[in-house]
């Protein structure tokens, strides 16, 4: 069984994240979506909320694939968390050259620390390239329409959280 580890903050999950997750299911038997918990950061959604939104978005988009996805939290090094879950693939989505430069540096460091874990880059689809969770939060907080950038479940949760 090929287990892939897909880390991120997913605050909130965007269509870009979902695009990468769908691609990941084509290269791995199981995908661990790992929500990073960072002390000092104040996320919009709690871990439990993010986990539920990821699961709902996946079930709305690919019903029947939920059994192949597990959502976990982690607060340690990505490679250590991947090992704890038996993953040998580390998945990273790429939107542009800036992402590539950063992710290549991270992949090199991860390779030094964990030569048994291979980083796999998955390119974002054309429609999801400009999307970031930070921009989604900012646009939504200012009353903008983000329905083209997030799954339906996330849109509903954003509207409820921001009382719109």
Curated annotation (Swiss-Prot):
Substrate binds at residues 9, 41, 78, 92. SUPFAM superfamilies: Nucleotidylyl transferase. Its EC number is 2.7.7.3. The record marks 17 as: Transition state stabilizer. ATP binds at residues 9-10, 17, 93-95, 103, 128-134. InterPro entries: Cyt_trans-like, PPAT, Rossmann-like_a/b/a_fold. One of its GO terms (biological process) is coenzyme A biosynthetic process. GO terms for cellular component: cytoplasm. Pathway: Cofactor biosynthesis; coenzyme A biosynthesis; CoA from (R)-pantothenate: step 4/5. It is found in: Cytoplasm. GO terms for molecular function: ATP binding; pantetheine-phosphate adenylyltransferase activity. Its cofactor is Mg(2+). Its main location: cytoplasm. It comes from the Bacteria. Homohexamer. Reversibly transfers an adenylyl group from ATP to 4'-phosphopantetheine, yielding dephospho-CoA (dPCoA) and pyrophosphate. Belongs to the bacterial CoaD family. This is Phosphopantetheine adenylyltransferase. It comes from Agrobacterium fabrum (strain C58 / ATCC 33970). The gene is coaD.
């Amino acid at each position: 069984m090929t287990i892939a580890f897909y880390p991120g903050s997913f605050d909130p999950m965007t269509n870009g994240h979902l695009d990468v997750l769908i691609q990941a299911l084509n290269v791995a038997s199981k995908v661990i979506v790992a929500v990073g918990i960072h002390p000092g950061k104040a996320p919009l959604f709690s871990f439990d909320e993010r986990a539920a939104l990821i699961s709902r978005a996946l079930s709305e988009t690919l019903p029947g694939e939920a059994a192949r996805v597990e959502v976990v939290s982690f607060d340690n090094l990505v490679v250590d968390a991947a090992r704890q879950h038996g993953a040998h693939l580390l998945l990273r989505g790429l939107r542009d050259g800036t992402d590539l430069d950063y992710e290549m540096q991270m992949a090199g460091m991860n390779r030094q620390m964990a030569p048994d874990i291979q980083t796999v880059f998955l390119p974002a689809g054309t429609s999801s390239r400009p999307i970031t969770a930070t921009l989604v939060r900012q646009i939504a907080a200012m009353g903008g329409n983000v329905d083209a950038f997030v799954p339906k479940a996330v849109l509903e949760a954003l509207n409820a959280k921001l009382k719109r």
